[in-house]
Amino acid sequence: MKKIIMTGGGTAGHVTPNLALVPELKKSGYEIKYIGSIEGIERKIIEKEGIEYFPISSGKLRRYFDLKNFSDPFKVLKGVFQAKKIIKREKPDIVFSKGGFVTVPVVIAAHLNKIPVIAHESDITPGLANKLATPYCTRVCVTFPESVKHIKGDKAVLTGTPIRRELLEGNKLEGIKLCGFKDNKPILLIIGGSLGSKIINEIVRKNLDNILSKFNIIHICGKSNLDENLENRKGYAQFEYVNEELPDLMKASDLVISRAGANVIYELLALKKPNLLIPLSKKSSRGDQILNAASFEKSGYSLVLKEEELEDKTLMKKLNYLYENRNVYINNMSKSKMDNGVKNITELIKKYTK
């Protein structure tokens, strides 16, 4: 049996695409193992899937000054030695890396063990982890056509992003039942990313009466961001984080407010959900979500509201516009030729398996 080691972590966006590949890889005869960080979100997600998980030391890669920048390189170095030992013992035929800071030591370790590495970059421009890892990769899968020019060494392959099959098979009635909605108002799903979004949470709750006058709300607010004062609010269902329930909640929703991470916007495209994107500002990111959102807005798939312009009036104005023109966005998304990347990436993995 062929063996693959997968890696990726830090946020759910670096983990769920790996899960999307798992059924197809198993069908193709691969035994799957996973290397991730000790305390990252990926550990709980992967172990729940019954995949053997190997934790290693990892340091966060920052673009700003922090005292931890002096100690974290030593954590990365420790992670390289740990990953090298795991890879030498497990003898995988190939490594697949989805990005996030934990992947850098794994990719370097695979290279030192002469194991081919396929990486995947979701955003238009590569993140710092993938930039550091690219020299050690055999090929780098990209999601956007615009991304090809940003990958050095002629390694880029346009594959699209992998989307979990079960996400496309949600049950609308189950989603409504889970939320306890009793009327026929349109449903607004709000996603702030796997770690939540303070600014989106705050403005939604500030305008709750106004929004609830038109919509029922499913609010995925992130860990430790539940508001106990709103637990029994009619028409408002809040969740810290969802996994198995997400397909049903997505299916039940009529509109979506979301950050603009590449994975989630491609999921919205696949599901043809009219969406309002609020990308992370450059104050708190490298600007990748701004580029992702601009690409989808240009294609007519999304309406965009800059974080700097996020106010009570602008939020309600954009929401109302999106709902009134929802069929235009659905029609535009229906014409998209973007592929689910599962098949393309699996074929590439098979091609470069030792």
From Swiss-Prot:
Gene3D superfamilies: Glycogen Phosphorylase B. It is a peripheral membrane protein. Keywords: Cell cycle, Cell division, Cell membrane, Cell shape, Cell wall biogenesis/degradation, Glycosyltransferase, Membrane, Peptidoglycan synthesis, Transferase. It catalyses: di-trans,octa-cis-undecaprenyl diphospho-N-acetyl-alpha-D-muramoyl-L-alanyl-D-glutamyl-meso-2,6-diaminopimeloyl-D-alanyl-D-alanine + UDP-N-acetyl-alpha-D-glucosamine = di-trans,octa-cis-undecaprenyl diphospho-[N-acetyl-alpha-D-glucosaminyl-(1->4)]-N-acetyl-alpha-D-muramoyl-L-alanyl-D-glutamyl-meso-2,6-diaminopimeloyl-D-alanyl-D-alanine + UDP + H(+). UDP-N-acetyl-alpha-D-glucosamine binds at residues 11-13, 164, 194, 289. GO terms for biological process: carbohydrate metabolic process; cell division; cell wall organization; lipid glycosylation; peptidoglycan biosynthetic process; regulation of cell shape. Cell wall formation. Catalyzes the transfer of a GlcNAc subunit on undecaprenyl-pyrophosphoryl-MurNAc-pentapeptide (lipid intermediate I) to form undecaprenyl-pyrophosphoryl-MurNAc-(pentapeptide)GlcNAc (lipid intermediate II). This is UDP-N-acetylglucosamine--N-acetylmuramyl-(pentapeptide) pyrophosphoryl-undecaprenol N-acetylglucosamine transferase. It comes from Clostridium botulinum (strain Langeland / NCTC 10281 / Type F).
